[in-house]
Amino acid sequence: MSSILSEYSETNGNMVELIICNNDGMAEGAVSALQGAGYNTGDGKTIPVFGVDATDSAKQLINEGKMTGTIKQDAEGMASTIVNLVSSVKNGGNLMDNTSSFNVDEGVAKIRVPYATYTGE
């Protein structure tokens, strides 16, 4: 991240505008690198950083104004969905049998499990 910040900087006229990470650990690393470059210290000079998992440490960074947001995935909802799919196959059915109560994308084997955003208390 530090090398990216030196290549894409205000001085070079091509600044990083947004950082989206696959998890909060990566987002926290990005925040740390940004802080080393004078951004996201809580003083308003901020590059938005988003993560996934809604960890306590990420929520704290968000509440301090150092990180922008995170997504909390529904682990129980995902587990329940998987159990339903496994049960269908175990009982001799099709993988997507008994999914009428789920949010299923038509034409593909994909089920959407709701999530929640967190952008501060």
Give the role of each language-model region.
Residues 77-121:
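Hinge/cleft segment of the Venus flytrap/periplasmic-binding protein
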Residues 33-36, 64-65, 85:
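Short, glycine/charged-enriched secondary-structure capping and boundary segments
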Residues 64-76:
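Short beta-strand elements at the ligand-binding edges of bilobed clamshell
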Residues 24, 73-76, 80:
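Electropositive phosphate-/nucleotide-binding environments in soluble metabolic enzymes
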Residues 53, 74, 121:
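Residues at the C-termini of beta-strands that transition into short coil/loop
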Residues 1-59:
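Hydrophobic alpha-helical
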